[in-house]
Structure formats: structure tokens, C-alpha cells
Design a protein with these regions (language model features):
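A cross-family glycoside hydrolase active-site/sugar-binding cleft signature
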Residues: 61, 94, 163-164, 192
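Conserved SGNH/GDSL esterase-like catalytic core that processes O-acyl groups on lipids
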Residues: 27-33, 38-125
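N-terminal secretory targeting modules
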Residues: 1-43, 51-55, 79-89, 141-156, ...
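Active-site segments of SGNH/GDSL-like serine hydrolases
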Residues: 98, 131-179, 183-184
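Short regulatory "switch" loops immediately downstream of catalytic or recognition motifs
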Residues: 101-103, 133-143, 194-204
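Soluble or luminal CAZymes and related metallo-dependent hydrolases
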Residues: 69-74, 119-130, 142, 169-173, ...
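Catalytic His-Asp segment of secreted/periplasmic serine-dependent ester chemistry enzymes
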Residues: 165-258
Length: 258
């Protein structure tokens, strides 16, 4: 068997790396995603949606995390760095645990007033921190001499995009995230509205929630059984549909450049 010289292998790897970097640099936008198991890279919808939107996907979602973890990762600099922030066009949040993320009863006027690190006791407070901190970080680039936004009036324009759960079973979260979006004037990726089925109608053959058709596991919400985690992979129908819904929302904010 003929051996391939090590130099040839290294050269090929170098060319592939440079090609990937070049393709990323040619994208019109960069979108940063934070989330948990519904958003992690093994799903595929975010990457599909970014491709349709001519955007570079920066997927920092990790299964098992919550919005509290996202807040803590901003604090320790692992969700994004200041250098990355310079190039991020939108922060997309898909932390969709079925909690009230709008409750204003314990919110602080200033994000610096929250005790850190965050625990998982108050989802609304963690959302409030992430939003205010991201907006502040974008604004403060106006004081960074290395930033292209240095000495500008507004700093870096901050775009935050919220997401519903992938179907309409999680009423508490879906309702409250829309209230949160309305409060801030943020766009919402309405997966639950455009996924193609509703909790209000059962499947005519199975007699179950239609979401059960697309998952290998299940969850109980208010005594009713729904599908839980949609099947992973870009080839899966739900991932493709979610990618299309996401791209449709993002194109309304960021038009595809010629």
C-alpha cells in the first residue's frame, strides 16, 4: 500500500482549514445561539436556518443548561468574547424551559445589582440579566478604541431574538416569552405557530398529540402527553421546518445581501 507523505496530509488539512475560514468570512452575518438540548448543534435547525440566511452559525447551546447558565457564561466570558461581539449580528436565545420568563416582581433596575453566579431559582431574572448585559456590552463598544464602533453615538446596534418552544405544548413559557419580547421590542421566532400542528387537535389515527410523531421521548404538561425532543439531524423533517421558520424571521431583520 502506497504511503501518503505527512507533508501532503498537513498541506491538505491546511487548505481545508483556510477554505472553511474563507467561506465563513464570506457570509453576510454571524448569529450567536444560546440554548439547551433543543438548540445544541446535534439538532441542525440553527445551522440550516443560518445557511438559508447567509449567516455564519455560532452555536453555543449545550444540552442540560438553562438561562441561568447562559448568564453565568456571559459573566465568565465563555458565551462570547469582546472580540467576537464585534462581529456578532444577533444574539438568539432558545432557553425554553416551561417557566415564566416575564415575571417582573424580582427584577433589578440595573443588571449589576443581581447576585452572581446565578442559580436556577428565577428564570425571569436570568433572562433580564442576559438581555441587559448584552445590550450594555454592545453599547460599551463605543468606548473601545479597538472597535469599529468607537466614539459612535449608539455603540454596536444590539439585536436580540427570542424563540418559542418548538411546539405549543409549553403554554407558560410560550406565553411569557411573547410578553418579554413585547416589553423589549424584540422579534420572536414563532416555532409553535408555524410548526404545522397544534395541541388543540389530536392526530386522527393515533389519537395522540401530533408532536409525538416526531420524538423518541415524551413529556407530560398539565396532565397531557406531548412529544419532547424532536429527532436530531439536518435530514429530519422537524429540524428542516424549524430551520425554515428561523430563516424566515431572520430575513425580515437581516435581508440577504446580493
Amino acid at each position: 500500500m502506497k504511503r501518503i507523505p505527512v507533508f501532503t496530509v498537513l498541506l491538505a488539512l491546511c487548505i481545508l482549514t483556510l477554505s472553511a475560514q474563507d467561506n465563513a468570512s464570506k457570509k453576510s452575518y454571524t448569529f450567536l445561539l444560546t440554548g439547551a438540548s433543543f438548540a445544541s448543534p446535534n439538532n441542525g435547525w440553527f445551522e440550516i436556518g443560518c445557511e438559508l440566511s447567509d449567516a455564519n452559525p455560532l452555536n453555543r447551546a449545550i444540552g442540560g443548561e438553562t438561562i441561568a447558565d447562559a448568564a453565568n457564561r456571559i459573566i465568565d466570558g465563555t458565551l462570547y468574547t469582546i472580540e467576537e461581539l464585534e462581529h456578532i449580528d444577533a444574539l438568539v436565545i432558545m432557553q425554553v424551559h416551561d417557566r415564566d420568563v416575564f415575571d417582573e416582581s424580582q427584577l433589578k433596575p440595573n443588571y449589576t445589582e443581581y447576585p452572581v453566579p446565578f442559580d436556577r431559582s428565577n428564570y425571569a431574572a436570568a433572562f433580564d440579566y442576559v438581555i441587559k448585559r448584552y445590550l450594555a456590552d454592545c453599547y460599551n463598544l463605543k468606548f473601545d478604541r479597538k472597535s469599529k464602533y468607537f466614539n459612535s453615538r449608539s455603540g454596536k446596534p444590539a439585536v436580540v431574538v427570542l424563540c418559542t418552544d418548538w411546539h405549543d405544548g409549553r403554554v407558560t413559557y410560550n406565553t411569557s416569552v411573547r410578553k418579554l419580547a413585547e416589553k423589549w421590542g424584540f422579534p420572536v421566532v414563532e416555532f409553535d405557530k408555524f410548526i404545522g400542528f397544534s395541541r388543540n387537535a389530536l392526530h386522527p389515527v393515533t389519537g395522540e398529540q401530533i408532536s409525538r410523531l416526531f420524538t423518541g421521548d415524551k413529556q407530560e404538561i398539565d396532565g397531557e402527553i406531548f412529544g419532547w425532543h424532536p429527532e436530531n439531524g439536518k435530514e429530519q423533517y422537524i429540524q428542516q421546518r424549524m430551520g425554515a421558520v428561523f430563516a424566515d424571521t431572520m430575513r425580515k431583520i437581516f435581508p440577504v445581501k446580493p
